[in-house]
């Protein structure tokens, strides 16, 4: 997705790209059920894909949320975007076990159905299936930053493996290592780009204050 979608954005802006990753005439599988996955679905359809299938490892949510149980939590319900309306098969509670290919090109995915047991997703025996794919787009989130990067600096991590950093206005985004700051996904975990932009600006102010003793940058 990180190659597929930006390339299309450039084309939409009028750029001419050589070797653009295209979905036309292909059986496309999108791994990931979030917004990025939906964007991949819509773009693949507009390219002229033969088929588009979207994988989500979590079970299919209900079409309507349980209203009394919602607030203050994010309502859990099936969300259908305009990209889905363009056409795609949505597979829930499915996990990819293996990429299958010939001569360096993907030809399919070996998949298995999963379910929750004791709070963990486990494979359901006897449900392995190979699904045809000419193009596989990865639109998953991530669990935590690459540990080797944080370990190389000696940065403390939280329970989820993210960098620990303060978030107050004085010394904000400072880690336990002097002169090392952390902001965005590496600190808060997988999130939206608007959060990364916000924290990046706040961290820039914190670094400016650290270096200059004051800052005129906005909070």
Where are these regions (language model features)?
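Residues forming the flavin
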Residues: 1-219
């Amino acid at each position: 997705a990180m190659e597929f979608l930006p390339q299309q954005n450039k084309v939409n802006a009028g750029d001419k790209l050589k070797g653009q990753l295209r979905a036309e005439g292909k059986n496309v599988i999108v791994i990931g059920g979030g917004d990025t996955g939906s964007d991949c679905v819509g773009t693949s359809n507009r390219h002229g894909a033969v088929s588009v299938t979207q994988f989500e490892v979590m079970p299919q949510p209900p079409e309507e949320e349980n209203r009394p149980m919602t607030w203050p939590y994010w309502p859990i319900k099936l969300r259908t975007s305009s990209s889905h309306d363009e056409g795609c098969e949505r597979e829930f509670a499915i996990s990819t076990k293996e990429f299958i290919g010939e001569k360096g090109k993907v030809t399919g995915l070996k998949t298995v159905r999963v379910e929750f047991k004791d709070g963990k997703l486990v494979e359901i025996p006897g449900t392995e299936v190979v699904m045809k794919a000419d193009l596989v787009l990865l639109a998953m989130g991530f669990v935590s930053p690459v540990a080797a990067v944080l370990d190389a600096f000696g940065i403390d991590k939280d329970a989820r493996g993210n960098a620990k950093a303060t978030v107050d206005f004085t010394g904000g985004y400072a880690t336990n290592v002097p002169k090392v700051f952390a902001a965005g996904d590496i600190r808060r975990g997988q999130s939206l780009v608007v959060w990364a932009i916000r924290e990046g600006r706040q961290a820039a102010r914190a670094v400016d204050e650290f270096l200059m003793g004051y800052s005129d940058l906005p909070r």
